[in-house]
């Protein structure tokens, strides 16, 4: 079978990571991994520059291999068919932007060869495949800057049906008068930490750094249960 190489890209609220993948056997090509940290609340220019840096670094490690396309795992809400950012609360500076066109511009890969899927769905389908496809049904959950979910039913990614929430999503599921992601995500840690200390942080790492530096250590230990 002919080797077919594509870029596998994971975009999250704090980073972009990419690696060359051989679709003929779904293997990762060693020494092609690239990652750049960038927060989702930055300006569109900063975010896109970070993405471009990671993609070009990965492509530079391809050692002359022809890259046929890009597969992008992207958090919801996002128009995965058109490749357009839709979120107000995450990557807000990118809302309405055609991400497919932007990625094509910086990589030279045709827009028609750039595909998107939900990041949690990509995780769930990958886990199902690596598990040897032994189980007919699987639920995958991702916890990070957001709260993602993937439902595998009879070996297929499902977004509707018995036991599957609308769109196959849990992040916007009603919970305690708000949505689940407000409680099960980085955003909740940031909000609760500010309530307990009066100090704003960005990301859980910021909270850990303060704790390791000794600041708020006593308060954090005393407040751990209510946190």
Functional labels for PLM-detected ranges:
Residues 1-6, 11:
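N-terminal charged helix/coil linker that caps or initiates catalytic domains
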Residues 5, 19-21, 31-32, 44, ...:
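Glycine/GP-enriched mid-protein hinge/lid loop-to-helix segment characteristic of carbohydrate kinases
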Residues 14:
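Conserved Rossmann-like nucleotide-cofactor binding loop
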Residues 29-65, 215-218:
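N-terminal phosphate-binding loop and adjacent alpha-helix
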Residues 40-52, 66-70, 76-137:
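Glycine-rich phosphate-binding loop and adjoining helix at the ATP-binding site
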Residues 48, 221-227:
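Amphipathic, non-transmembrane alpha-helical scaffold segments
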Residues 70-76, 143-145, 227:
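Glycine-rich beta-strand-to-loop/alpha-helix junction loops that act as flexible
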